């Protein structure tokens, strides 16, 4: 039995609130149960130096956790003077995932910077961030089209992400912290709205897992992501 009494395939209640802040071209508060992440998308003209003159755009991401997003306060990384390896890994994952969803030529020489700030953490912050950031990015792209900065829609498809894992011998979806911290296997899956895989991060925390268990986890993720994309589409409509 899961701590939350959810069924193995059941995600937490998911809500996406658009236009959560006033200034960003796209802004979203995404909530997976008690995990809450603010995602903003800033549209800027110009690209990094390595892309200048190539007629294509760029999407990049930053990620951070507020000091009291966790059970006990942690220092701000700015105060420590450097980002942790975890932070760097997560923001690269977010950036890679979102770039897969965008036609960079259609974006032109423009950049979208995604900022994901975890307000409250209860497991699955990176997958929630990807899910919310995609919606914020859609709003930023629509803003640019409305301003005639770009002519066509660079979005190829929606993407979303979910955590899956093996907890007490059972494959489960959308792990909260109590499950994540005790899982035998922990996996983060990013997919397109049609179920194609963008990224899989999987680790045997306790016991090695089999090919059959891997396939079961990917099937679980695919079904959950289909539901999450429905939430994204509902928010965008």
Swiss-Prot record:
InterPro entries from the UniProt entry: ExoRNase_PH_dom1, ExoRNase_PH_dom2, ExoRNase_PH_dom2_sf, PNPase/RNase_PH_dom_sf, Ribosomal_Su5_D2-typ_SF, RNase_PH, RNase_PH_bac-type, RNase_PH_CS
Record carries keyword Membrane: no
EC code: 2.7.7.56
Keyword Ubl conjugation found: no
GO molecular function: 3'-5'-RNA exonuclease activity; tRNA binding; tRNA nucleotidyltransferase activity
Key words, A-Z: Nucleotidyltransferase, RNA-binding, rRNA processing, Transferase, tRNA processing, tRNA-binding
Gene Ontology biological process terms, A to Z: rRNA catabolic process; rRNA processing; tRNA processing
Binding locations of phosphate: 86, 124-126
Catalytic activity: tRNA(n+1) + phosphate = tRNA(n) + a ribonucleoside 5'-diphosphate
PANTHER family: EXOSOME COMPLEX COMPONENT, EXOSOME COMPLEX COMPONENT RRP41
SUBUNIT field: Homohexameric ring arranged as a trimer of dimers.
Role played: Phosphorolytic 3'-5' exoribonuclease that plays an important role in tRNA 3'-end maturation. Removes nucleotide residues following the 3'-CCA terminus of tRNAs; can also add nucleotides to the ends of RNA molecules by using nucleoside diphosphates as substrates, but this may not be physiologically important. Probably plays a role in initiation of 16S rRNA degradation (leading to ribosome degradation) during starvation.
Protein name per UniProt: Ribonuclease PH
Source organism of this protein record: Shewanella denitrificans (strain OS217 / ATCC BAA-1090 / DSM 15013)
Lineage, highest ranks first: Bacteria, Pseudomonadati, Pseudomonadota, Gammaproteobacteria, Alteromonadales
């Amino acid at each position: 039995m899961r701590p939350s009494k959810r069924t193995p395939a059941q995600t937490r209640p998911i809500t996406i609130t658009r236009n959560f802040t006033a200034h960003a071209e796209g802004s979203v508060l995404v909530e997976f149960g008690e995990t809450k992440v603010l995602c903003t998308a800033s549209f800027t003209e110009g690209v990094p130096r390595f892309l200048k003159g190539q007629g294509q755009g760029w999407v990049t991401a930053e990620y951070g956790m507020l000091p009291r997003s966790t059970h006990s306060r942690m220092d701000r990384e700015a105060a420590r003077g450097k980002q942790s390896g975890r932070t760097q890994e997560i923001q690269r994952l977010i950036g890679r995932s979102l770039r897969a969803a965008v036609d960079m030529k259609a974006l032109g020489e423009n950049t979208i910077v995604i900022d994901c700030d975890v307000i409250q953490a209860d497991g699955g912050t990176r997958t929630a961030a990807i899910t919310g950031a995609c919606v914020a990015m859609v709003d930023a792209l629509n803003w640019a089209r409305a301003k005639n900065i770009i002519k066509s829609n660079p979005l190829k498809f929606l993407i979303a992400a979910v955590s899956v894992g093996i907890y007490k011998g059972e494959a489960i979806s959308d792990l909260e912290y109590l499950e994540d911290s005790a899982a035998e296997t922990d996996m983060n899956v990013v997919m397109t709205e049609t179920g194609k895989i963008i990224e899989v991060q999987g680790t045997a925390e306790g016991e090695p897992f089999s090919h059959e268990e891997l396939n079961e986890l990917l099937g679980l993720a695919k079904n959950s992501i289909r539901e999450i994309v429905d939430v994204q589409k509902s928010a965008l409509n």
